[in-house]
């Protein structure tokens, strides 16, 4: 149908490395399982600190990060990420996910440096499509 968005079943993420930063184990596993189903290579971190420490090793194509994280939150994470040089990962596209589906949350996330925003519960088709679009502009 013209104008309809693709379903995740038709989106191929083979070769795309996604870093998920999410403290909730169930949410982290759900996102990872779905992205892997579409062919993505997935690395998972439970905190912003661990994600930043190992970013050079992971070299993801896209980051998916919760905004509500213990310690440094998702906004602090993206600001720290954007201060890095591009070769250190400072220009990696990043998607914020949040249970707080308010207009100001999405605006705040984009202003801080996120490339995209999805409200929880995350529509998995929207996630896969957004990841695909970010690596295939």
PLM ranges: what are they?
Residues 39-46, 54:
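Short hydrophobic/Thr-rich beta-strand motif most characteristic of the beta2 strand and flanking loop
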Residues 47, 73-79:
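Acidic catalytic/metal-coordinating carboxylates
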């Amino acid at each position: 149908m013209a104008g309809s968005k693709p379903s995740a079943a038709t989106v191929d993420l083979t070769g795309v490395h996604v870093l998920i930063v999410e403290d909730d184990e169930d949410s982290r596993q759900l996102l990872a399982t779905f992205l892997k189903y579409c062919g993505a290579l997935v690395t998972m971190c439970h905190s912003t600190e661990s994600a930043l420490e190992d970013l050079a090793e992971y070299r993801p194509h896209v980051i998916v990060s919760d905004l509500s994280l213990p310690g440094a939150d998702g906004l602090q994470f993206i600001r720290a990420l954007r201060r890095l040089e591009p070769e250190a990962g400072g220009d990696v596209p990043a998607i914020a996910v949040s249970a707080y589906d308010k207009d100001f949350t999405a605006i705040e996330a984009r202003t801080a440096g996120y490339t995209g925003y999805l409200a929880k519960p995350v529509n998995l088709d929207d996630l896969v499509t957004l990841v695909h679009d970010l690596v295939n502009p």
